Amino acid sequence: MSSLVTQINFNKINNSQSTVKDYILLMKPRVMSLVIFTGFVGMWLAPDSIHPLIAGIAVICIALGAGSAGAMNMWYDRDIDILMKRTQNRPIVRGVIEPDEALSFGLITGFFAVFFMALCVNILASFLLLFTIFYYICIYTIWLKRRSIQNIVIGGVSGALPPVIGHAAVSNTISLESIILFLIIFIWTPPHSWAIALFCNDDYKHCKIPMMPVVKGTLYTKKQILIYSIILFIVSLMPFFIGMNNDIYLIIVCIIGLVFLYYAFSLFYDTPDNKQAKRFFTYSIFYLCFIFILLSSTSTIHSLRDIIFG
């Protein structure tokens, strides 16, 4: 692997080719957008109020924190990114950003995100943001990803924390509501990620990354996806049962949850080419986004109804 990296020399890096777009790509914008969205919903659902300017700063800090983690992840994984089809177009691999520049960018961006969260918002939100960045880089990227079949499960903690950070930015506490938001994302992450691993199995095998399909095989992975999908369906009902949301939420979340289970069962009985894995993966993104939209919208409607009708 190292000889291959040396041979192509990261496409003969040329600093003059670096653009703002390349640095945005370095921050994993698709992942970052989901982090921003779930973090914002965490803020929206917090019972306390926050000044719009402070809220804006908190969202920017969450975004920069996610971006810094993405940049440092690309810095560390550059040797395997170059071997995988779905990551061969990343900025470091293409040679438009040097590895050292990517690391410096990630560290500086992360520092400012944590610093301004502490200065302008509160210490708890800042600490949670720092912990999230640390966990994603040190625990998941460096320690677990290349060593453990449970890399996605344990590493999923970092991806599930943004709504907790957002909630803490407003309330300065970690509440039951924010923990439930955490659990929804935490349980959602393994089946979502294992679906990717199914249709990118050859890439992971080539890079010797111990994803579940590589180590345990396709059938075992599909069983785990199905189990986690059932657990996720149950967890998604919790906001209703603790009074976070109303019966509208319950009805809609049951419908989209049953569709999620349908895709999970379809994947379990899928043909060996795993065509259903891509469909499951696509729907899983829609499912998570829709749940968080539903949480914020039904909560708002419920609050307005209470204000209008007492």
UniProtKB/Swiss-Prot annotation:
It is a multi-pass membrane protein. It holds the Pfam family UbiA. It is found in: Cell inner membrane. CDD domains: PT_UbiA_Cox10. Keywords: Cell inner membrane, Cell membrane, Heme biosynthesis, Membrane, Transferase, Transmembrane, Transmembrane helix. The keyword Ribosomal protein does not apply. Its EC number is 2.5.1.141. PROSITE patterns: UBIA. Its main location: membrane. Pathway: Porphyrin-containing compound metabolism; heme O biosynthesis; heme O from protoheme: step 1/1. It catalyses: heme b + (2E,6E)-farnesyl diphosphate + H2O = Fe(II)-heme o + diphosphate. InterPro entries: Protohaem_IX_farnesylTrfase (IPR006369), UbiA_prenyltransferase (IPR000537), UbiA_prenylTrfase_CS (IPR030470), UbiA_sf (IPR044878). Carbon 2 of the heme B porphyrin ring is defined according to the Fischer nomenclature. This is Protoheme IX farnesyltransferase. It comes from Rickettsia prowazekii (strain Madrid E).
